[in-house]
Amino acid sequence: MTNIRKSHPLMKIVNNAFIDLPAPSNISSWWNFGSLLGICLILQILTGLFLAMHYTSDTTTAFSSVTHICRDVNYGWIIRYMHANGASMFFICLYMHVGRGMYYGSYTFLETWNIGVILLFTVMATAFMGYVLPWGQMSFWGATVITNLLSAIPYIGTSLVEWIWGGFSVDKATLTRFFAFHFILPFIIAALAIVHLLFLHETGSNNPTGISSDMDKIPFHPYYTIKDILGALLLILALMLLVLFAPDLLGDPDNYTPANPLSTPPHIKPEWYFLFAYAILRLIPNKLGGVLALVLSILVLMLMPLLHTSKQRSMMFRPLSQCFFWILAADLLTLTWIGGQLVEHPYIIIGQLASIMYFLLILVLMPVASMIENNLLKW
């Protein structure tokens, strides 16, 4: 009798992707974040769906509909906070996943890497639009400030901003379209994630050593299914600790004040996961320059395969490159901290130095370090 798992057209796809998939025997916990991102996405779609059942995307009722969800809907508060903090967990997993790719040279899988960068942009766009929906002070002013950046584009900028707003300011039309986009984008993300996996399975997974693991493969199930379940349990534990004990820890108190176009908050800032990019944006005195730096801070990831000068793929056996990688990690934490501070001395100069350091590390120092390591090994 033929095994349905291997003969049924649909089950065959699942089998080849999650059950009989040959996987390297030595992949560490850093390889768990892909599955965790999948879990985060499913969680966000489900909680978001239930929130959308009670939310109204109208400027007059949006804020009160969110309050209504928290106060009157059965377990509405937990759904709302799981969705808000789920986004934070999503970005923690995303940054870890990208960092893993950089450290172990996974960017040499060109298609997988580039789709990953597109996914990162899409998730960032989705999160930004979601932050606007509760229509609090920070929602409104965050939307105003960030969309206004497009006016820096020469010639078409102003028209483009007004077209996105659907008027001459952030208003009802803006909120409605942001809700529509926020609803559809996660499904586009899911589709892109499938393509991401498709390209990954063309080559097979990388591993910590960066060398071919063709001679030593193990089946994905049960080894990595069990490992992924452990990762998922730890993720859910962390999320629920956040939701049940400190739901507003990562939020902004200003968002508990309804949006008021006549009163600007003293300090406009995005959610914590955008602070590093926001710091780079506002520390460049020129508007267009700031916008370009903001886009390049993420787009620079696409250059990673071109900047790979080492004869080895992974950083596992490259101490100098490791050193620069962890300096980059510390630099990103510094930028995140600066993004949350006021634009005043000494934060301005610290931020400018950290911004220069960010681009310098990726574009110059890490490729040079790789060349030095090649020479030291007489390659």
Curated annotation (Swiss-Prot):
Membrane topology: Multi-pass membrane protein
Name this protein carries in UniProt: Cytochrome b
Binding site for heme b b566: H97, H196
Chief location bin: mitochondrion
Segments passing through the bilayer: 33-53, 77-98, 113-133, 178-198, 226-246, 288-308, 320-340, 347-367
Domain of life, source organism: Eukaryota
Other notes: Heme 1 (or BL or b562) is low-potential and absorbs at about 562 nm, and heme 2 (or BH or b566) is high-potential and absorbs at about 566 nm.
GO-annotated cellular components: mitochondrial inner membrane; respiratory chain complex III
Binding partners and assembly: The cytochrome bc1 complex contains 11 subunits: 3 respiratory subunits (MT-CYB, CYC1 and UQCRFS1), 2 core proteins (UQCRC1 and UQCRC2) and 6 low-molecular weight proteins (UQCRH/QCR6, UQCRB/QCR7, UQCRQ/QCR8, UQCR10/QCR9, UQCR11/QCR10 and a cleavage product of UQCRFS1). This cytochrome bc1 complex then forms a dimer.
Annotated GO MF terms: metal ion binding; ubiquinol-cytochrome-c reductase activity
This protein's UniProt keywords: Electron transport, Heme, Iron, Membrane, Metal-binding, Mitochondrion, Mitochondrion inner membrane, Respiratory chain, Transmembrane, Transmembrane helix, Transport, Ubiquinone
Swiss-Prot/TrEMBL cofactor(s): heme b
Pfam families reported for this sequence: Cytochrom_B_C, Cytochrome_B
Xref: CDD domains: cytochrome_b_C, Cytochrome_b_N
Protein localization: Mitochondrion inner membrane
Gene Ontology BP, a term: mitochondrial electron transport, ubiquinol to cytochrome c
Residues that hold a ubiquinone according to the record: H201
Disulfide bond annotation, renumbered to this chain: none
Co-factor remark: Binds 2 heme b groups non-covalently.
Binding-site list for heme b b562: H83, H182
Function text: Component of the ubiquinol-cytochrome c reductase complex (complex III or cytochrome b-c1 complex) that is part of the mitochondrial respiratory chain. The b-c1 complex mediates electron transfer from ubiquinol to cytochrome c. Contributes to the generation of a proton gradient across the mitochondrial membrane that is then used for ATP synthesis.
